[in-house]
Design a protein with these regions (language model features):
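Beta-sheet ligand-binding and adhesion/scaffold domains
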Residues: 2-31, 35, 62-115
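N-terminal glycine/threonine-rich, aromatic-flanked beta-hairpin/loop signature
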Residues: 28-56
Length: 115
C-alpha cells in the first residue's frame, strides 16, 4: 500500500501540548505553506505576538528554525526536529522537539491540525 506524501500547504494547526520550557500554547495558531520540500509557517497567539519558521520536510521528518517576537518585547528563537504524523480521525499532527538558541532549554510540543 502506497502512503500519500505529507503536504503541509494550507494547513492550520493549534498547539495541543506545550512543554514547560515552551512559549506557544493552546491560543497559538500556525499557518503553513509548502513548496516542494520547503516549509514555511507564520504563527502567533498567547504570549507570541508573531513568529515565523523556515524548514524542510523529507518524508515525515520536518526540520526548521524559528524566530518569534513575544509580548514581553523580547525576540527569541531556536531549532526544531519534528515527526509529522497522519491520523485518520484528526488529521496531521506534528511532534516538535525544540532547542532554544537564545535562552536555555529544550523540550517537546505537539501541534494538531484544525479541520
Amino acid at each position: 500500500m502506497h502512503m500519500k506524501a505529507i503536504n503541509l500547504d494550507g494547513v492550520v494547526m493549534y498547539v495541543s501540548s506545550t512543554d514547560d520550557r515552551g512559549v506557544v500554547d493552546a491560543k497559538t495558531r500556525l499557518y503553513f505553506t509548502q513548496k516542494g520540500s520547503r516549509v514555511f509557517a507564520r504563527y502567533g497567539g498567547g504570549s507570541v505576538v508573531r513568529g515565523c519558521l523556515v524548514g524542510t520536510l523529507f518524508g515525515s521528518e520536518l526540520v526548521f528554525r524559528y524566530t518569534q517576537l513575544e509580548d514581553s518585547g523580547q525576540i527569541h528563537g531556536g531549532r526544531s526536529t519534528c515527526e509529522v504524523q497522519r491520523k485518520a480521525q484528526t488529521g496531521l499532527r506534528v511532534i516538535e522537539h525544540f532547542t532554544w538558541s537564545t535562552r536555555s532549554g529544550s523540550g517537546t510540543n505537539v501541534f494538531a491540525e484544525i479541520r
